[in-house]
Amino acid sequence: MDCSCVSDLLFAPPALPALWTPGFAFPDWAYKPESSPGSRQIQLWHFILELLQKEEYQGVIAWQGDYGEFVIKDPDEVARLWGIRKCKPHMNYDKLSRALRYYYNKRILHKTKGKRFTYKFNFSKVVLVNYPLLDMAAAATGSPLLLTPSPFGGAPGPDAPPLTPETLQTLFSAPRLGEPGARTPLFTSETDKLRLDSPFPFLGSGATSYSKPPGLLGPYGRAFPEYPWNFNPYLTGPFPKLPPSLYPPHFYPNPLASSLGHLPSSGAGGGPTATPLLASTGEGLGPERPSGLAAAPRLALPGAGGPEAALGGKEDSDSELEITDVSGCSSDSEGDEGLPAPPKAKAGKGGTGS
Protein backbone atom coordinates (compact mmCIF):
# COMPACT_ATOMS: atom_id res chain seq x y z
CA MET A 1 0.00 0.00 0.00
CA ASP A 2 1.04 3.58 -0.49
CA CYS A 3 2.25 5.51 2.52
CA SER A 4 1.80 9.22 2.06
CA CYS A 5 1.32 10.03 5.73
CA VAL A 6 4.32 12.33 5.91
CA SER A 7 4.28 13.56 2.34
CA ASP A 8 3.67 17.07 3.64
CA LEU A 9 7.25 17.02 4.85
CA LEU A 10 8.42 17.26 1.28
CA PHE A 11 6.44 20.25 0.15
CA ALA A 12 6.87 22.59 3.11
CA PRO A 13 9.65 25.14 2.55
CA PRO A 14 12.73 23.94 4.42
CA ALA A 15 14.01 25.76 7.49
CA LEU A 16 17.63 26.61 6.80
CA PRO A 17 20.03 26.51 9.74
CA ALA A 18 22.73 29.14 9.89
CA LEU A 19 25.72 26.92 9.05
CA TRP A 20 24.48 24.64 6.31
CA THR A 21 22.03 24.21 3.48
CA PRO A 22 20.14 20.99 2.79
CA GLY A 23 21.60 20.44 -0.67
CA PHE A 24 24.18 17.84 0.21
CA ALA A 25 24.53 14.09 0.10
CA PHE A 26 27.24 11.49 0.37
CA PRO A 27 29.36 9.39 -2.02
CA ASP A 28 27.81 7.69 -5.03
CA TRP A 29 27.58 4.28 -3.39
CA ALA A 30 25.26 5.77 -0.74
CA TYR A 31 23.17 7.98 -2.99
CA LYS A 32 20.74 6.26 -5.34
CA PRO A 33 18.07 7.81 -7.53
CA GLU A 34 15.38 5.74 -5.84
CA SER A 35 16.48 7.09 -2.46
CA SER A 36 15.18 10.57 -3.17
CA PRO A 37 12.83 12.12 -0.60
CA GLY A 38 9.25 11.01 -1.07
CA SER A 39 10.25 7.54 -2.15
CA ARG A 40 9.60 4.45 -0.02
CA GLN A 41 13.15 3.31 -0.86
CA ILE A 42 14.73 6.22 0.96
CA GLN A 43 17.64 5.40 3.23
CA LEU A 44 17.58 6.16 6.93
CA TRP A 45 20.28 8.83 6.84
CA HIS A 46 18.32 10.66 4.12
CA PHE A 47 15.24 10.53 6.30
CA ILE A 48 17.16 11.91 9.28
CA LEU A 49 18.33 14.83 7.16
CA GLU A 50 14.74 15.53 6.18
CA LEU A 51 13.66 15.63 9.82
CA LEU A 52 16.55 17.91 10.73
CA GLN A 53 15.40 20.42 8.09
CA LYS A 54 11.95 20.88 9.61
CA GLU A 55 11.34 23.34 12.40
CA GLU A 56 8.29 21.43 13.60
CA TYR A 57 10.53 18.48 14.52
CA GLN A 58 13.04 20.47 16.58
CA GLY A 59 11.61 18.87 19.71
CA VAL A 60 12.17 15.42 18.22
CA ILE A 61 15.59 15.69 16.55
CA ALA A 62 17.83 18.72 16.22
CA TRP A 63 21.34 19.89 15.42
CA GLN A 64 23.60 20.64 18.37
CA GLY A 65 27.22 20.88 19.39
CA ASP A 66 29.86 20.47 16.70
CA TYR A 67 29.24 20.88 13.02
CA GLY A 68 27.26 17.88 11.77
CA GLU A 69 26.29 16.68 15.23
CA PHE A 70 22.65 16.02 16.05
CA VAL A 71 20.73 14.61 18.99
CA ILE A 72 17.61 12.45 18.93
CA LYS A 73 15.48 14.01 21.65
CA ASP A 74 12.55 11.64 21.28
CA PRO A 75 13.80 8.25 20.04
CA ASP A 76 10.36 6.64 20.07
CA GLU A 77 8.87 9.40 17.93
CA VAL A 78 11.72 9.23 15.42
CA ALA A 79 11.25 5.46 15.21
CA ARG A 80 7.50 5.91 14.75
CA LEU A 81 8.01 8.40 11.90
CA TRP A 82 10.53 6.08 10.28
CA GLY A 83 8.08 3.19 10.53
CA ILE A 84 5.36 5.27 8.90
CA ARG A 85 7.70 6.21 6.08
CA LYS A 86 8.73 2.61 5.48
CA CYS A 87 5.23 1.24 6.10
CA LYS A 88 6.45 -0.77 9.12
CA PRO A 89 4.09 -0.10 12.02
CA HIS A 90 6.14 -2.19 14.47
CA MET A 91 9.29 -0.09 14.09
CA ASN A 92 11.01 0.83 17.36
CA TYR A 93 14.22 2.57 18.35
CA ASP A 94 16.12 -0.68 18.86
CA LYS A 95 15.65 -1.57 15.21
CA LEU A 96 16.41 1.99 14.14
CA SER A 97 19.64 2.07 16.17
CA ARG A 98 20.77 -1.16 14.53
CA ALA A 99 20.24 0.48 11.17
CA LEU A 100 22.27 3.46 12.31
CA ARG A 101 25.14 1.18 13.34
CA TYR A 102 25.28 -0.06 9.76
CA TYR A 103 26.45 3.42 8.76
CA TYR A 104 29.37 3.32 11.19
CA ASN A 105 31.34 1.01 8.92
CA LYS A 106 30.37 3.08 5.91
CA ARG A 107 31.69 6.16 7.72
CA ILE A 108 28.57 8.11 6.94
CA LEU A 109 28.01 8.89 10.61
CA HIS A 110 29.21 7.79 14.01
CA LYS A 111 27.98 7.98 17.56
CA THR A 112 29.35 10.72 19.78
CA LYS A 113 31.03 9.20 22.80
CA GLY A 114 29.74 10.25 26.18
CA LYS A 115 26.47 11.67 24.83
CA ARG A 116 23.27 9.68 24.76
CA PHE A 117 21.28 9.54 21.50
CA THR A 118 23.84 11.84 19.89
CA TYR A 119 25.34 11.18 16.47
CA LYS A 120 27.53 13.07 14.07
CA PHE A 121 27.65 13.03 10.30
CA ASN A 122 31.07 12.55 8.77
CA PHE A 123 31.14 15.67 6.63
CA SER A 124 34.62 14.87 5.33
CA LYS A 125 32.84 12.36 3.08
CA VAL A 126 30.14 14.79 2.02
CA VAL A 127 29.90 15.73 -1.64
CA LEU A 128 27.45 17.97 -3.41
CA VAL A 129 25.04 16.34 -5.80
CA ASN A 130 21.79 17.31 -7.42
CA TYR A 131 19.84 16.62 -4.28
CA PRO A 132 16.10 17.20 -4.80
CA LEU A 133 16.00 19.87 -2.07
CA LEU A 134 18.96 21.71 -3.59
CA ASP A 135 16.78 23.88 -5.80
CA MET A 136 14.66 25.03 -2.87
CA ALA A 137 17.78 25.77 -0.85
CA ALA A 138 19.32 27.73 -3.70
CA ALA A 139 16.12 29.76 -4.11
CA ALA A 140 16.05 30.55 -0.40
CA THR A 141 19.73 31.37 0.11
CA GLY A 142 20.95 32.36 -3.34
CA SER A 143 23.79 29.83 -3.20
CA PRO A 144 23.59 26.04 -3.48
CA LEU A 145 26.95 25.50 -1.83
CA LEU A 146 27.72 24.39 1.65
CA LEU A 147 29.47 26.93 3.82
CA THR A 148 32.47 24.68 4.30
CA PRO A 149 36.17 25.25 3.68
CA SER A 150 37.37 24.81 0.13
CA PRO A 151 38.52 21.22 -0.55
CA PHE A 152 41.52 22.62 -2.44
CA GLY A 153 42.84 24.62 0.51
CA GLY A 154 42.43 27.99 -1.13
CA ALA A 155 40.64 30.03 -3.73
CA PRO A 156 40.52 28.57 -7.25
CA GLY A 157 42.64 30.05 -10.00
CA PRO A 158 41.34 32.48 -12.60
CA ASP A 159 40.94 29.73 -15.18
CA ALA A 160 39.30 27.27 -12.77
CA PRO A 161 35.70 26.25 -13.50
CA PRO A 162 32.97 27.50 -11.18
CA LEU A 163 32.32 25.34 -8.14
CA THR A 164 29.03 23.65 -8.89
CA PRO A 165 27.47 20.54 -7.36
CA GLU A 166 28.48 18.56 -10.43
CA THR A 167 32.06 19.82 -10.08
CA LEU A 168 32.50 18.58 -6.54
CA GLN A 169 30.59 15.38 -7.27
CA THR A 170 33.06 14.57 -10.03
CA LEU A 171 36.02 15.49 -7.87
CA PHE A 172 35.15 13.30 -4.92
CA SER A 173 33.44 10.30 -6.50
CA ALA A 174 34.56 7.76 -9.04
CA PRO A 175 32.59 7.53 -12.31
CA ARG A 176 30.10 4.68 -12.53
CA LEU A 177 30.26 2.82 -15.79
CA GLY A 178 27.26 1.62 -17.71
CA GLU A 179 24.75 4.11 -16.36
CA PRO A 180 22.36 5.42 -19.00
CA GLY A 181 22.08 9.15 -19.09
CA ALA A 182 25.04 9.79 -16.83
CA ARG A 183 26.35 13.30 -16.49
CA THR A 184 29.15 14.43 -18.76
CA PRO A 185 32.37 14.06 -16.75
CA LEU A 186 34.03 17.26 -15.75
CA PHE A 187 37.52 15.98 -16.44
CA THR A 188 38.68 14.85 -19.87
CA SER A 189 41.28 12.18 -20.34
CA GLU A 190 44.52 13.90 -21.24
CA THR A 191 46.95 11.40 -19.85
CA ASP A 192 49.93 12.31 -22.02
CA LYS A 193 49.50 16.02 -21.50
CA LEU A 194 48.84 15.47 -17.82
CA ARG A 195 52.00 13.44 -17.44
CA LEU A 196 54.06 16.28 -18.89
CA ASP A 197 52.28 19.13 -17.17
CA SER A 198 51.80 17.78 -13.67
CA PRO A 199 54.48 17.89 -10.97
CA PHE A 200 54.78 14.08 -11.02
CA PRO A 201 54.58 13.05 -14.68
CA PHE A 202 56.45 9.79 -14.13
CA LEU A 203 53.75 8.25 -11.93
CA GLY A 204 51.80 6.79 -14.82
CA SER A 205 50.88 7.08 -18.45
CA GLY A 206 48.44 4.36 -19.40
CA ALA A 207 45.69 4.95 -16.86
CA THR A 208 42.62 5.67 -18.92
CA SER A 209 40.57 6.55 -15.87
CA TYR A 210 43.04 9.16 -14.70
CA SER A 211 42.02 12.55 -15.95
CA LYS A 212 43.06 16.14 -15.53
CA PRO A 213 40.75 18.69 -13.93
CA PRO A 214 40.90 21.91 -15.95
CA GLY A 215 42.34 24.82 -14.09
CA LEU A 216 43.55 22.75 -11.14
CA LEU A 217 46.90 21.51 -12.46
CA GLY A 218 48.84 24.24 -14.15
CA PRO A 219 51.79 23.73 -16.51
CA TYR A 220 55.04 22.88 -14.82
CA GLY A 221 57.04 25.38 -16.85
CA ARG A 222 60.48 25.39 -15.29
CA ALA A 223 63.46 23.73 -16.93
CA PHE A 224 64.74 20.76 -14.99
CA PRO A 225 68.47 20.81 -14.18
CA GLU A 226 70.96 18.15 -15.12
CA TYR A 227 71.10 15.38 -12.57
CA PRO A 228 74.35 13.80 -11.34
CA TRP A 229 73.11 10.32 -12.21
CA ASN A 230 72.67 11.31 -15.88
CA PHE A 231 68.98 10.68 -16.19
CA ASN A 232 65.87 12.80 -16.01
CA PRO A 233 63.11 11.50 -13.69
CA TYR A 234 60.55 13.47 -15.68
CA LEU A 235 60.92 11.38 -18.81
CA THR A 236 57.71 10.09 -20.33
CA GLY A 237 56.90 6.49 -19.70
CA PRO A 238 54.87 4.26 -17.42
CA PHE A 239 57.68 3.99 -14.89
CA PRO A 240 60.83 6.00 -14.15
CA LYS A 241 63.82 4.64 -16.03
CA LEU A 242 66.60 4.64 -13.44
CA PRO A 243 70.13 3.49 -14.32
CA PRO A 244 71.06 -0.03 -13.18
CA SER A 245 73.57 1.34 -10.67
CA LEU A 246 70.75 2.83 -8.58
CA TYR A 247 68.83 -0.43 -8.25
CA PRO A 248 69.62 -3.33 -5.90
CA PRO A 249 71.57 -6.22 -7.48
CA HIS A 250 68.52 -8.48 -7.79
CA PHE A 251 66.91 -6.07 -10.26
CA TYR A 252 69.59 -6.72 -12.89
CA PRO A 253 70.96 -10.29 -12.44
CA ASN A 254 74.03 -11.19 -14.48
CA PRO A 255 73.28 -14.40 -16.39
CA LEU A 256 76.92 -14.83 -17.42
CA ALA A 257 78.14 -14.67 -13.85
CA SER A 258 75.51 -17.10 -12.66
CA SER A 259 76.38 -19.62 -15.39
CA LEU A 260 80.12 -19.35 -14.78
CA GLY A 261 79.60 -19.92 -11.08
CA HIS A 262 78.86 -23.61 -11.72
CA LEU A 263 82.14 -24.20 -13.61
CA PRO A 264 85.33 -25.29 -11.74
CA SER A 265 87.88 -22.55 -11.42
CA SER A 266 91.34 -22.13 -9.93
CA GLY A 267 90.20 -19.47 -7.45
CA ALA A 268 91.05 -19.28 -3.79
CA GLY A 269 87.79 -20.98 -2.75
CA GLY A 270 87.68 -24.15 -0.80
CA GLY A 271 85.75 -26.15 -3.38
CA PRO A 272 87.18 -28.71 -5.84
CA THR A 273 89.06 -27.02 -8.66
CA ALA A 274 90.63 -28.09 -11.93
CA THR A 275 94.20 -27.99 -10.68
CA PRO A 276 93.69 -30.40 -7.73
CA LEU A 277 91.87 -32.74 -10.09
CA LEU A 278 94.88 -32.89 -12.37
CA ALA A 279 97.18 -33.16 -9.39
CA SER A 280 95.40 -36.23 -8.11
CA THR A 281 96.07 -38.07 -11.36
CA GLY A 282 99.61 -36.84 -11.70
CA GLU A 283 98.98 -35.04 -15.01
CA GLY A 284 99.50 -31.45 -15.92
CA LEU A 285 101.82 -30.79 -12.98
CA GLY A 286 104.24 -28.10 -13.99
CA PRO A 287 106.21 -25.36 -12.36
CA GLU A 288 102.94 -23.51 -11.56
CA ARG A 289 101.70 -26.20 -9.22
CA PRO A 290 100.52 -24.66 -5.93
CA SER A 291 102.51 -25.47 -2.83
CA GLY A 292 99.41 -26.68 -0.99
CA LEU A 293 99.08 -29.66 -3.35
CA ALA A 294 102.31 -31.32 -2.22
CA ALA A 295 100.40 -33.79 -0.06
CA ALA A 296 97.69 -34.62 -2.59
CA PRO A 297 96.66 -38.30 -2.85
CA ARG A 298 98.19 -40.28 -5.64
CA LEU A 299 97.26 -43.47 -7.48
CA ALA A 300 99.65 -46.34 -6.81
CA LEU A 301 99.77 -50.10 -7.19
CA PRO A 302 100.80 -52.37 -4.36
CA GLY A 303 104.53 -52.74 -4.45
CA ALA A 304 104.94 -50.09 -7.10
CA GLY A 305 106.38 -46.62 -6.93
CA GLY A 306 105.19 -43.25 -8.21
CA PRO A 307 102.42 -42.42 -10.66
CA GLU A 308 104.57 -43.33 -13.67
CA ALA A 309 104.98 -46.86 -12.42
CA ALA A 310 101.32 -47.07 -11.51
CA LEU A 311 100.24 -46.06 -14.99
CA GLY A 312 102.80 -48.28 -16.64
CA GLY A 313 102.02 -51.39 -14.64
CA LYS A 314 98.30 -51.24 -15.00
CA GLU A 315 98.24 -53.58 -17.99
CA ASP A 316 100.39 -56.25 -16.33
CA SER A 317 98.49 -56.39 -13.07
CA ASP A 318 95.38 -58.44 -12.47
CA SER A 319 94.53 -56.67 -9.25
CA GLU A 320 92.33 -53.60 -9.04
CA LEU A 321 93.73 -50.13 -8.50
CA GLU A 322 93.92 -48.97 -4.93
CA ILE A 323 93.97 -45.35 -3.88
CA THR A 324 96.80 -45.11 -1.44
CA ASP A 325 97.87 -42.00 0.42
CA VAL A 326 101.60 -42.35 0.95
CA SER A 327 102.20 -38.80 2.03
CA GLY A 328 102.35 -39.66 5.72
CA CYS A 329 104.21 -42.98 5.37
CA SER A 330 107.93 -43.36 6.09
CA SER A 331 110.25 -46.10 4.84
CA ASP A 332 113.84 -47.02 5.44
CA SER A 333 114.43 -47.34 1.71
CA GLU A 334 112.77 -43.99 0.81
CA GLY A 335 115.48 -43.31 -1.71
CA ASP A 336 114.72 -46.59 -3.48
CA GLU A 337 111.04 -45.77 -4.01
CA GLY A 338 109.77 -47.20 -7.26
CA LEU A 339 112.23 -50.17 -7.38
CA PRO A 340 110.99 -53.74 -6.99
CA ALA A 341 111.67 -55.45 -3.67
CA PRO A 342 114.90 -57.56 -3.65
CA PRO A 343 114.31 -61.31 -3.65
CA LYS A 344 116.18 -61.87 -0.36
CA ALA A 345 113.44 -63.73 1.44
CA LYS A 346 112.80 -66.07 -1.49
CA ALA A 347 116.47 -66.94 -1.88
CA GLY A 348 116.92 -67.46 1.84
CA LYS A 349 113.97 -69.76 1.97
CA GLY A 350 115.37 -71.86 -0.82
CA GLY A 351 118.84 -71.90 0.73
CA THR A 352 117.64 -73.34 3.97
CA GLY A 353 116.16 -76.29 2.23
CA SER A 354 119.24 -77.13 0.19
Curated annotation (Swiss-Prot):
* Keywords assigned by UniProt, alphabetized: DNA-binding, Nucleus, Transcription, Transcription regulation
Q: Which residues cross the membrane?
A: none
Matches recorded under InterPro entries? Ets_dom, ETS_fam, WH-like_DNA-bd_sf, WH_DNA-bd_sf
Q: Name one GO molecular function term.
A: sequence-specific DNA binding
| DNA-binding region, residue range(s) | 42-122
Q: Where in the cell is it found?
A: Nucleus
| SMART domains reported in the protein's UniProt record | ETS
* Any one cellular-component term (Gene Ontology): nucleus
> Which protein family is named in the record?
Belongs to the ETS family.
Q: What is this protein called?
A: ETS domain-containing transcription factor ERF-like
**Native source organism of the sequence:** Homo sapiens
Gene encoding it? ERFL
